[in-house]
Regions:
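His/Asp/Glu-enriched, well-ordered alpha-helical/loop segment
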Residues: 234-244, 262-274, 280-366
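C-terminal cap of metal-dependent C-N hydrolases
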Residues: 12, 344, 354-391
Length: 391
């Protein structure tokens, strides 16, 4: 017999936009959220799940992710990409934007075609091009030989190849063509992100005024904050038009830097990301990031040549746990950084990012230690809680 279209999740602490409801009840009608309330009587013809001792939070939204489960979004087959998506879904990421790394333009336009198909099918929420329009001075784990200036014609070529699936382009806006490309992206409804940049404070302000709205992994791959030359960090933190990405894995950021970002930008302007590469959810070993060899040791990815950090092996549930248990952030702020803020940035907050009636039934069940115990996506269990369910 088919499972009932209606599910009732009871007894958990449910994190809503208005606050946390203890001993809450969340009703799932098919693929959508039906409603929420303190636990009350029986719903007829519903599958009931007693989640006492758990949290229910919105599904996580990852703006910046290069792969996982041993698979790369830049170079893998369709099956590889689906493996990476499935790996992150099992860790609570119900909405994912696939990020590419620097490559030849011909390669990236072809890649855009493959990833756009998966976007059209609903497996991905879109494409983020990180490179090749970045600064050689702040290239990080990108091949310097393949970098190029952000000429608008090249940026437009990637957008055209994406068939509407491009969601974000990271670029060093101080390079020739940078500001014009920011304006092009803004005109076409694609997020212009400042990253891998050697820009000054003043140049970054110009980029924001031209339409840039995201800081790609703030603090990383950009000049440090200085008292005479504040650089891009100060400009990005102070402007209310900008959302700042943070990689909260304990490697990319000192806790004081994360605290500074939340204090200066505020909880509504922070988006936790993974910047994950193939090893996320898979393990240590040798990998490729684009054309560059990477060695992952104790969960930290570094280029074999030069030793630069090469993305992360983070999953967003780990970012949640660290934020709660190490950084001591309130759960409501963490949920905004993992779900509501990136959903709003993508223009998808009418469907995802919070637990409200009519929105997609995307949610994560966490235990008291914030370990994932269940993942629901569009009303179907990706990971079913190990508790008794009674129809």
């Amino acid at each position: 017999m088919a499972a009932p279209a209606r599910k009732v999740l009871t007894g958990a602490r449910v994190v809503l936009p208005s606050g946390t409801v203890d001993d809450g009840e969340l009703v799932i009608d098919g693929a959508h959220i039906g409603g929420s309330a303190p636990s009350a009587g029986q719903e007829p013809e519903a599958e009931r799940w007693d989640l006492s001792g758990h949290w229910i939070v919105p599904g996580f939204v990852d703006l910046h992710n290069h792969g996982g489960g041993g698979a790369s979004f830049t170079s893998g087959t369709v099956d590889d990409v689906l493996t990476g998506i499935a790996t992150h879904r099992a860790h609570g990421t119900t909405t994912l934007v696939a990020s590419t790394v620097t490559g030849e333009m011909e390669f990236l336009t072809a890649r855009a075609g493959l990833l756009s198909e998966l976007t059209e099918q609903g497996d991905l929420a879109g494409i983020h091009f990180e490179g090749p329009f970045i600064s050689p001075c702040r290239k990080g784990a990108h091949s310097e030989a393949l970098l190029r200036d952000p000429h608008p014609a090249d940026v437009a070529a990637l957008l055209d190849a994406s068939r509407g699936a491009a969601r974000m382009v990271t670029l060093a806006t101080e390079l020739p063509g940078g500001l014009d490309s920011v304006r092009l992206l803004a005109d076409r409804g694609v997020i212009a992100a400042v990253g891998h940049t050697d820009a000054t404070y003043e140049q970054t302000v110009e980029a924001i005024d031209a339409g840039a709205t995201v800081a790609t992994h703030l603090f990383n791959a950009m000049p440090p904050l200085g008292h005479r030359a504040p650089g891009p960090i100060a400009a990005l933190l102070e402007d209310e038009r900008v959302t700042v990405e943070l990689i909260n894995d304990g490697t990319h950021l000192h806790p004081a830097a994360l605290e500074l970002a939340f204090h200066r930008a505020g909880a509504d302007r922070v988006a936790f990301i993974t910047d994950a590469m193939d090893a996320a959810g898979f393990g240590d070993g040798r990998y490729l990031l684009g054309p560059l060899e990477v060695d992952v040791v104790d969960g930290v990815a570094r280029l074999i040549e030069g030793g630069s950090i090469a993305g992360s092996t983070l999953t967003l549930d780990r970012a949640f746990r660290r934020a709660a248990l190490v950084d001591k952030l309130p759960v409501g702020q963490i949920v905004r950084a993992l779900s509501a803020n990136p959903a709003r940035l993508l223009g998808l907050d009418h469907r995802i990012g919070s637990l409200e009636p009519g929105k997609d039934a995307d949610l994560v069940v966490l235990d008291e230690g914030f370990e994932v115990k269940g993942v629901l996506r569009r009303g179907d269990w990706v990971v079913a809680p190990q508790v008794a369910a009674a129809a």
